[in-house]
From Swiss-Prot:
Catalytic activity: chlorophyllide a + oxidized 2[4Fe-4S]-[ferredoxin] + 2 ADP + 2 phosphate = protochlorophyllide a + reduced 2[4Fe-4S]-[ferredoxin] + 2 ATP + 2 H2O
InterPro entries according to UniProt: ChlB/BchB/BchZ, LI-POR_suB-like_C, Nase/OxRdtase_comp1, P-CP_red_C, Protochl_reductB, Protochlorophyllide_Rdtase
Subunit architecture: Protochlorophyllide reductase is composed of three subunits; BchL, BchN and BchB. Forms a heterotetramer of two BchB and two BchN subunits.
Binding site for substrate: 428-429
The protein's name in its UniProt record: Light-independent protochlorophyllide reductase subunit B
GO biological process, one term: light-independent bacteriochlorophyll biosynthetic process
Gene name of the record: bchB
Cofactors named for this entry: [4Fe-4S] cluster
Chain positions recorded as [4Fe-4S] cluster binding sites: 36
Amino acid sequence: MRLAFWLYEGTALHGISRVTNSMKGVHTVYHAPQGDDYITATYTMLERTPQFPGLSISVVRGRDLAQGVSRLPSTLQQVEHHYHPELIVIAPSCSTALLQEDLHQLAAHSGLPQEKILVYALNPFRVSENEAADGLLTELVKRFASPQEKTAQPSVNLLGFTSLGFHLRANLTSIRRMLQTLGIAVNVVAPWGASIDDLRKLPAAWLNIAPYREIGSTAAEYLADAFAMPALYEAPIGVEPTLAWLRSLIEKLNAAGAERGVAPIVMPQLNAFSLDGLSAPSGVPWFARTADMESFSNKRAFVFGDATHTVALVKFLRDELGMQIIGAGTYLERHADWVRKELEGYLPGALIVTDKFQDVAQIIDDQMPDLVCGTQMERHSCRKLDVPCMVVCPPTHIENHLLGYYPFFGFDGADVIADRVYLSCKLGLEKHLIDFFGDAGLEYEEPEVSAPSEEPVALSVAPNDHPSPEAAAEAVVIAEEGEMKWSDEAETMLKKVPFFVRKKVRKNTETFARASGASMISVDVFRQAKESLGG
């Protein structure tokens, strides 16, 4: 086990509670030591919903262990008395695994009807957030889905939308809008907002939509095997993928409708999918061909995240914005083979598979891309490196749980992603222009006072002192041990380089100087390095 700080995936409890907290009438009881109910704070801080998380803790204490008693039966009774849930999910902890407690036996001692209890038996040492969430959703579907009459008109289930999902509500709204445009009803969304009765109705739909590789795809596979329900697994992220997704959706539903004698669904004019119903559904195809965006064809991008968003963003950046992909990776080893297959021909090297954020930060430091699409961890790393970064998947922070409409799915989502790519790369230029030319009197003017330097220098000069040219020429900036020395004039030239590529230029210049045998970087060395690197 590693110390649980800055991990890409949460614990098994995190995944379990994401599913149960999404549902109506479902409560989680976590059998664990005091303090392990920290997860409730995560939902109240990030989810921005009026409901309090449906999670209680059955405390495992040393005194109870010494006496040979357990609090789990009484906790289950209290939950039943206070909340009256339709289902109680009992989640094991590392402590219960070490103690080898029989949770089924303890639950039976509560006196509650066993059909109201689900002991989700997994190994909390080996199973992490996404696998636990996907497994629990599948277990619930297996337990409650029952044969149903198909709906009279085309309908679909939306699977895998869970609490704390990335841009969850906006993505749902985007998909609902596209389905409504096609005249397709939503039978059930699960687990988000679903009740136990909703799970029973799942087989009534004509088709299952499971756009997330991490959560929901296994449940869709079970429904395909048990109830012969077709499924659509692709994520509609980007303009071309959304068009392909719509065509596949219509094809699958028309095949099911032909067996029932229902009139086929016809793809409408594309402007029917736009927000105003008049214009093109997305501005990305036009925007990508503007002079402003064509400069992106020379920009280098690095993508790291979960399976679904890594694949989608790599394809979007290269195929629709024309950016160069210098590398990509995922922290989900169990989905790495699928990611490799999907990105065949897109990557210049091997797919990076790691769950250590330090490794990813080192790759970013070595490559210094123009844009990083990653997680909250990459956002932190890129701030230290002055590299533009946009968060595209979990883990996230409050900035990615917005009240407004910012989907990643559909045509609307393509516009949102393109805007974020553009702003992430371009806003740095504004700061550089202000650094270079000053604030142009936008705030105040102090002609007598020079602006403070962004970077410390070794030479200290009093306000009225004027060092001689010889002293200025000899003054150098003393770098950290093991780094090259820079003359004042070379440092001044370096500061004219935009801040968002300054570190890369410094690093490349020092590499050139070492290879050339120079002991100090002067203006001449700096210019030679620039010429050799094609600057």
